[in-house]
Each structure stands twice: as C-alpha cells, then as structure tokens.
Amino acid sequence: MNTTLFRWPVRVYYEDTDAGGVVYHASYVAFYERARTEMLRHHHFSQQALMAERVAFVVRKMTVEYYAPARLDDMLEIQTEITSMRGTSLVFTQRIVNAENTLLNEAEVLVVCVDPLKMKPRALPKSIVAEFKQ
C-alpha cells in the first residue's frame, strides 16, 4: 500500500472557533474532509471526475480523539494517509498538528465507495486501487 503521507496546511479563521475562543470540534471534521478531498485531487482524482464515473465516497464511521485545542490564526497541518483498502472501502488515518508539531487530534475515517445515483456500495475504481496500492 502506498503509505505516502499527504500534508495539507490550513489556517484557523474566526468562523472555525467557538465562544470559548478555540476551534469548534465540528470544524476539525470539515478540515479532515477537505484534506481527504485534496489528497485525492493531488493524485488526480477530482470529485467531479469521480461523480461522472458514478463514484462517490460516504463516511461510514469516524472516530476522533481530541488532545489539545487550536486557536484563532493558528497554522495547522492536516496529515492524511490511507491505511486500509478493501473492495468497497478505504480507511483514512488523519492527524492535525500545529506549527510546533504538537498533535492536537487524530481521526480514523472509514469511507465507502457508492454509486451516487443508487446510493449503494460499489467496487473501488481500479484506478484508485492501482494508485494507492503502489
């Protein structure tokens, strides 16, 4: 399996924070989603092209552990890798670190490949399997 770590930078904006002045927990989920999308794009799999092939990914399960907060204007790095691949699913392991490389939280995300018209599982495209099995 291609275990190359994909790194995606993000800055914390006011809209990402809560009344306590720290990043709202759900904002991390959005950061993770964007990083997975950017990882696929980096490997030449755009969401639009995948949809044209009747391929979409839906989150089946997500586990997040929070260790330390991020704050307004912090620069963060979202680290993403595919740690498991099966016939219809991928498991992403993702971490968010700050500029000091402190681990703020980490997630394991199980996504299932579906036909977006039927919303039923389908096999992962051979091109994705080939790209990430290298």
From Swiss-Prot:
The active site is at residue 18. Keywords: Cell inner membrane, Cell membrane, Hydrolase, Lipid metabolism, Membrane. InterPro entries: 4-hydroxybenzoyl-CoA_TE, HB-CoA_thioesterase_AS, HotDog_dom_sf, Thioestr_dom, Tol-Pal_acyl-CoA_thioesterase, YbgC/YbaW. The keyword Membrane applies. It is found in: Cell inner membrane. The keyword Lipid metabolism applies. It is an enzyme of class 3 (hydrolase). It is a peripheral membrane protein. One of its GO terms (biological process) is lipid metabolic process. Its EC number is 3.1.2.-. One of its GO terms (cellular component) is plasma membrane. GO terms for molecular function: fatty acyl-CoA hydrolase activity; thiolester hydrolase activity. Interacts with ACP, PlsB and PssA, forming altogether a complex at the inner membrane. Thioesterase that appears to be involved in phospholipid metabolism. Some specific acyl-ACPs could be physiological substrates. Displays acyl-CoA thioesterase activity on malonyl-CoA in vitro, catalyzing the hydrolysis of the thioester bond. NCBIfam families: PRK10800.1, thio_ybgC, YbgC/FadM family acyl-CoA thioesterase. PANTHER family: 4-HYDROXYBENZOYL-COA THIOESTERASE FAMILY MEMBER, ACYL-COA THIOESTER HYDROLASE YBGC. Belongs to the 4-hydroxybenzoyl-CoA thioesterase family. This is Acyl-CoA thioester hydrolase YbgC. The lineage of its organism: Bacteria, Pseudomonadati, Pseudomonadota, Gammaproteobacteria, Enterobacterales.
